Amino acid sequence: MDLSIFFAGTAGSIPTPRRGLPALLVRRGGDRILFDCGEGTQRQLVSTVGLTELTEVFLTHFHADHWLGLPGLLKTFDLRGRERPLTIHGPPGLQELLTLALRLAGRVKFELALVELAPGQLLERDGYAIAPFPVAHRGAAFGYVLFEHERPGVFDPEAAVCLGLAPGPEFGRVQHGETIRGVIPSQVMGPPRPGRKLVISGDTTPCAALGVAAHDADLLIHEATFADEERDRAAQTGHSTAAQAAAAARQAQVRMLALTHISSRHPARLLRVEARAGFTNTVTPRDFDTIEIPFRENGEPRLLHWDAGAPEQEPGTGAREQEPSPEQEPGTERSADTVA
C-alpha cells in the first residue's frame, strides 16, 4: 500500500513565483485527502497530478491563506458533474465559514458534509485513522496525525510445519487469525509490525501537544515561517522558526522533517541549514514535490522532486534530496510579508 504526500503549495501567507499557498495532498491506496486549500490550489493540482476526486478535506484553521481556494475547487467539482459526497473537516466555526462562502460562490449539487472536530477525536478509516490535536496559533487551530493500524507479524512457515500445519490453505487461515488444530497465530507469527505515521503541524508556535502527536512519526511536516533571527516575531504571530521545527522533530524522534509555509523573507536554503543544525534529516520540499513513506522494513522516507530524475543521496544525511537552485526571486528579497 503506497503512502505519499504531494506538496501542492508550500508558501507562507503570500504566494511567490515559485511557491503557492498551503495545500498538501495525501495519497494512500485509492484515498486522496487534501489538507488545507489555499487560493490557487485547484490550478496547482490541474497543472500537475490532475484534479483528483478527493476523498476528504481537512482544514487546519481559518486564516485565508489556508482555505480561500476551497470554494472555487468545490464549484469546479460541481461543474464537472461530481456525484460522490465530500466531507470537509475543521475546527469549530467551519460550518458558519463555509456556509457563508458557498452562499457567495454558489451552492453545489453534490452532497457536502461540514464536520467540526474536537481535539482528540479519532476518525477511523480503512486501515488507518486521522486525529486532530490543538496547536498554538491565533484562534482555533489544529494539527493532524494520520496513522496506520498495526500489521500482522511475519509468518514463520517452518514453525508452522513443526507444529503440524500443512502448507496451503491452513497457512493462510492461521495468518488471518484462525486457530487451526490447536495452533494459535501467535505461535507462528512474529510480533505485530507498526504502520506508518504522518503528522502535519499546521500553523503553530512550539507546543507540547505537537510533540506528543508527533512521537515516533515517519514524517513530520512542520511550518517554518521564520529564520532564527526572527524568533521573537514568530512567537508574537503564532508561528515557528526552522530551528524550532527541528527541535520538535528531534524531541519527538521522527524519521524525517519536512519544512513548509516558507516565507519569501527567507531563502529555503537558509531555513534548511538552520534546521539541519538541530535535526539532520530535514528537507524543504518545493511545490509539486512528493515525499514517499515506505514501511520501515523497506527503507527511509524520500523526497522526489517534480522537475528532476531519480533523487540523489546527500552525503551524511538520510534525506534523499537534490540541492535546489537559490530560492529567492529578483525583487522579493526580504519582502515584508503580512503573516497570517
Q: Model-flagged regions — what are they?
A:
Residues M1-G50, E83-P85, Y144-L146, G153, ...:
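Conserved beta-strand hairpin/beta-sheet module of binuclear metal-dependent hydrolase folds
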Residues G93-A105, L114-L117:
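A gly/proline- and charged-residue-enriched helix-loop-helix capping module
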Residues T16, D126-A213, L219-I221:
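Active-site-proximal loop/helix segment associated with metal-binding centers of metalloenzymes
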Residues P119-G120, C207-E314, T338-A340:
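Binuclear metal-ion centers of metallo-dependent hydrolases, dominated by the metallo-beta-lactamase
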Residues F35-G38, T55-F62, P91, V199-T204, ...:
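Active-site neighborhood of phospho(di)ester-bond hydrolases with catalytic His/Asp-centered motifs
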Residues G69-F77, A101, H266-R276:
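Metal-dependent catalytic neighborhoods of phosphoester/phosphodiester hydrolases
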Residues A310-E323, G331-T332, A336:
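Short, basic, low-complexity termini and linkers enriched in Ser/Thr/Gly/Pro
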Residues D31, E39-H89, E111-E116:
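Active-site metal-binding motif and surrounding structural segment of the metallo-beta-lactamase
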